[in-house]
Amino acid sequence: MAPFWIALQFLTILPIELKTIPTAQQNGRAILFYPLVGLIIGGILFLVTCIFVKLPALLLAAIVFALWIWLTGGLHLDGLADTADAWVGGFGDKLRTLQIMKDPSCGPIGVLSIVIVCLLKFALIYVLIEQHQSLFLICIPILGRVVPSILFLTTPYVREKGLGRSLTDHLPKTASWIITGFVLLLPLYWEWQGLIAIISFLISLVYLRHVFIKRIGGITGDTVGAAIEIGETVLIFTFVVSYFYLV
């Protein structure tokens, strides 16, 4: 179960103490448990909506969204900001783009990207709660945590070192494809809404993958984080929009 605890420690701020430093093989296997960590995150969010169901929807949405960011430590938002800064500041140059991604400071474009994504997510969570569709909150983080598997399975990793290299080199491919396929079927519980949402989600990932390859020749940890945030936002957005047009 070491890979599960590695995944839980990496993807959340939960106080998990590992007895030893994870090996490259353990890091690679840990990615298989990312969707399970997403289930834990989504389950907590849904549980909060059930416990505080009597609160005004706007306040409850703020609580849920703040809790979501807190549970993940803003990990993927950091990747989104770094990617946005690098894409604008890199001026189309691969080496400059990769160099900017390594800069720990956050520029104005990075801040703007976080603000836009957070505003959209907050508004969409509010609509889910108001329309009694909070159950979908469980599904969102699960789908978001399958993004790394999809990208690492299909896209070159451009850096020679780092966690991403371990994940790429030691990811169990067959098991990862099976888990990914199962996770992608989950939104079908919501029938046409879920189908439209998952198709839009996959289209967004295909597009982002194309953009990443065109600019830097593949992916980095930051671009994977950005893809998670953008993919989740697209997933909720299309689910909410289809709810009003199909129900």
From Swiss-Prot:
Keywords attached to this entry: Cell inner membrane, Cell membrane, Cobalamin biosynthesis, Magnesium, Membrane, Transferase, Transmembrane, Transmembrane helix
Superkingdom classification of source: Bacteria
Pathway the protein contributes to: Cofactor biosynthesis; adenosylcobalamin biosynthesis; adenosylcobalamin from cob(II)yrinate a,c-diamide: step 7/7
Gene Ontology cellular component list: plasma membrane
Main location class: membrane
Compartment(s) where it occurs, according to its Swiss-Prot or TrEMBL record: Cell inner membrane
Biological processes, Gene Ontology terms: cobalamin biosynthetic process
Catalytic activity, as annotated: alpha-ribazole + adenosylcob(III)inamide-GDP = adenosylcob(III)alamin + GMP + H(+); alpha-ribazole 5'-phosphate + adenosylcob(III)inamide-GDP = adenosylcob(III)alamin 5'-phosphate + GMP + H(+)
GO molecular function, one term: adenosylcobinamide-GDP ribazoletransferase activity
Short name of one Pfam family: CobS
Residue intervals passing through the bilayer: 31-51, 55-75, 109-129, 135-155, 183-203, 227-247
EC number: 2.7.8.26
The protein's enzyme class: transferase
Names of required cofactors: Mg(2+)
Membrane-protein topology: Multi-pass membrane protein
Record flagged with keyword Cell inner membrane: yes
Annotated PANTHER family: ADENOSYLCOBINAMIDE-GDP RIBAZOLETRANSFERASE (PTHR34148:SF1)
General function of this protein: Joins adenosylcobinamide-GDP and alpha-ribazole to generate adenosylcobalamin (Ado-cobalamin). Also synthesizes adenosylcobalamin 5'-phosphate from adenosylcobinamide-GDP and alpha-ribazole 5'-phosphate.
Family: Belongs to the CobS family.
Protein name (Swiss-Prot/TrEMBL): Adenosylcobinamide-GDP ribazoletransferase
High-level lineage: Bacteria, Pseudomonadati, Pseudomonadota, Gammaproteobacteria, Moraxellales
